[in-house]
């Protein structure tokens, strides 16, 4: 039995709760198998008092979505002086805001798609840019709320303004880039292998279901790309990780249009999924690391003041 007591934070109350429970359970299982004393914590509004009672040596952050990866839980852990995994307060908050993250990443020479941040009600009145374009909640993950507006389509007013929209009122609208979906993980200060995502044909893109349903997508890792494009994806992933100030692990998503040669950075994820169908474990495996290796590395990398 190892000496450290690890609290695995999971669940929470974001729309990605089920994903977080899956990630957290898998990580907790591995940590227990490695001999750590593990407390599985389903995060709620009393998390500070729960952690004060548990007095863990390390908090393993397996939360996803608002509160879990936007700087708030990180602030609680800093206040309680509990070392934790993944990025710190500032980087988490910045990465979660897709609009601001794009500005920072573009400032270090990373190619991004033209975009604008606006109210969802304004999008519902007229096209904010010439279609095709993509509408996303500015602070959500797992492709939740993503709408693709194709050429010659009308304004998607019911989807964005209607009562079925359950996300925040601010959205980011960006030019739709056709082509291949690529992603690259960073671990510490090293870019790992590039992975291509091939959603099953009945999925329009790599959405929530294709991410988490068994057989929803195929992960080709390493991706079959020219050495120039492959290295550019790695370079931009590391540049984004460093510009935003990420710590631990991150994963950047890209679109590559083979016809034009355009390679565009889309967004960064500071809390990559660790579910059985997640990308990050597959990327790490291609680099010669087991699931247990990466979980162990995250624990050893944990600290405050990240």
From Swiss-Prot:
Enzyme class name: ligase
Keyword match Ligase: yes
Binding site for ATP: 128-183
Organism for this UniProt entry: Bartonella henselae (strain ATCC 49882 / DSM 28221 / CCUG 30454 / Houston 1)
Compartments, as annotated in UniProt: Cytoplasm
Record SUPFAM superfamilies: Glutathione synthetase ATP-binding domain-like (SSF56059), PreATP-grasp domain (SSF52440)
Binding residues for Mg(2+) 2: 267, 269
GO cellular component: cytoplasm
Name the record gives this protein: D-alanine--D-alanine ligase
Reported function: Cell wall formation.
List of residues binding Mg(2+) 1: 253, 267
Pathway(s): Cell wall biogenesis; peptidoglycan biosynthesis
Record's cofactor remark: Binds 2 magnesium or manganese ions per subunit.
PANTHER family per UniProt: D-ALANINE--D-ALANINE LIGASE (PTHR23132), D-ALANINE--D-ALANINE LIGASE B (PTHR23132:SF23)
Keywords, sorted A to Z: ATP-binding, Cell shape, Cell wall biogenesis/degradation, Cytoplasm, Ligase, Magnesium, Manganese, Metal-binding, Nucleotide-binding, Peptidoglycan synthesis
Family membership: Belongs to the D-alanine--D-alanine ligase family.
Catalytic activity: 2 D-alanine + ATP = D-alanyl-D-alanine + ADP + phosphate + H(+)
């Amino acid at each position: 039995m190892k000496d450290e007591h690890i609290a695995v934070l999971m669940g929470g109350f974001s729309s990605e709760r089920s994903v977080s429970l899956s990630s957290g359970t898998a990580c907790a299982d591995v940590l227990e198998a490695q001999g750590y004393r593990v407390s599985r914590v389903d995060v709620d509004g009393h998390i500070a008092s729960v952690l004060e009672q548990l007095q863990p040596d390390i908090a393993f952050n397996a939360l996803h979505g608002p509160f879990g990866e936007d700087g708030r839980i990180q602030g609680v852990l800093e206040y309680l002086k509990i070392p934790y995994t993944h990025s710190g307060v500032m980087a988490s908050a910045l990465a979660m805001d897709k609009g601001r993250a794009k500005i920072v990443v573009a400032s270090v020479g990373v190619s991004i798609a033209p975009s604008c941040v606006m109210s969802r009600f304004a999008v519902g009145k007229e096209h904010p840019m010439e279609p095709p374009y993509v509408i996303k909640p500015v602070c959500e993950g797992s492709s939740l709320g993503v709408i693709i507006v194709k050429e010659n389509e009308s304004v998607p007013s019911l989807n964005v303004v209607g009562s079925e929209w359950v996300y925040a009122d601010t959205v980011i609208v960006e030019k739709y880039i056709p082509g291949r979906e690529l992603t690259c993980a960073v671990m510490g200060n090293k870019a790992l292998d590039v992975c291509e995502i091939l959603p099953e044909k009945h999925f329009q893109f790599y959405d929530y279901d294709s991410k988490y349903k068994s057989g929803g997508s195929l992960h080709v890792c390493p991706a079959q790309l020219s050495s120039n494009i492959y290295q550019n994806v790695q370079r931009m992933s590391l540049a984004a990780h460093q510009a935003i100030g990420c710590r631990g692990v991150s994963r950047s998503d890209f679109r590559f249009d083979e016809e034009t040669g355009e390679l565009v950075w889309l967004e960064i994820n500071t809390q990559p999924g660790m579910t059985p169908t997640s990308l990050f474990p597959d990327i790490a495996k291609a680099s010669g690391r087991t699931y247990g290796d990466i979980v162990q590395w995250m624990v050893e990398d944990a600290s405050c003041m990240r």
